[in-house]
Amino acid sequence: MADDWESAADSEIVIRPNATNNINKWEGEDDDEDVKESWEDEEEKKDEEKPTKTEAPVKTKPNKALKAKLEEQERLNEEEERKRLANMTAEEKLAEKLRLQKIQEESDLKSALDTFGVTSIGGGLDAFNPQSKEEFKEFGATLSWKVAQYRESVHFPEFIEDLVRSLCVNLSAADIKKVKMSVESLHSEKQKMEKANAKKSAAKAKGKVSLRKESDDIDDYQKYGNDFTDDYDDFM
């Protein structure tokens, strides 16, 4: 009986392998992933370290044909303008001259306005409605330029006198005094300039030397009846 129990106990004994000796089939895969990631990082670093190539700007060559065409067109326009001017009548030439003169005057006006630091006059004197000091300054520059166009007329001085008088009527006595002082200062400066110019003209006149020829003396004798030529003819 005891032998039977021992036999049964022996038969139930199962030898199991040590769990510590089991080989994990996933073992080492983490190491492979770490190696792969480090390799990818190195590749990215190499890509970043590569110098970036800058593309040189493409130089556009000038179109010689287009340039020549534009020059030819400009030449034809100038030639056509010369022909147009040559075929003009006297009246048309005068009108063209006045047109060019007007353009020049407008250009001079623009230069004057730029000198005074004012803007464009827009629609002319009627377009002005000055309110500020700068706007009155601009209006005055435009009005002065417009009036100065008639300075060559013999009636211009009288016109200015009447204009100043009519404008000063609207001023107080104190303001008129300021205008008077300003005009007197301008008068003094004008006198100095005119005197200096007169002295220069007189100095130039004195510097001129009149030259006389020998024939001038003979002419003088002839004026007083001493005609040697007639005496010689009578002798012959």
Curated annotation (Swiss-Prot):
Residues 47-58, 68-88, 188-197 have a biased composition (Basic and acidic residues). Keywords: Coiled coil, Cytoplasm, Initiation factor, Protein biosynthesis. HAMAP family: eIF3j. Residues 28-46 have a biased composition (Acidic residues). Component of the eukaryotic translation initiation factor 3 (eIF-3) complex, which is involved in protein synthesis of a specialized repertoire of mRNAs and, together with other initiation factors, stimulates binding of mRNA and methionyl-tRNAi to the 40S ribosome. The eIF-3 complex specifically targets and initiates translation of a subset of mRNAs involved in cell proliferation. Pfam families: eIF3_subunit. One of its GO terms (molecular function) is translation initiation factor activity. Signal peptide: none annotated. This is Eukaryotic translation initiation factor 3 subunit J. Belongs to the eIF-3 subunit J family. One of its GO terms (cellular component) is eukaryotic 48S preinitiation complex. Residues 201-210 have a biased composition (Basic residues). Gene3D superfamilies: Eukaryotic translation initiation factor 3 like domains. Component of the eukaryotic translation initiation factor 3 (eIF-3) complex. The eIF-3 complex interacts with pix. Residues 61-112, 174-209 form a coiled coil. InterPro entries: eIF3-like_dom_sf, eIF3j. It comes from Drosophila virilis. Residues 1-88, 188-236 are annotated as: Disordered. One of its GO terms (biological process) is formation of cytoplasmic translation initiation complex. It is found in: Cytoplasm.
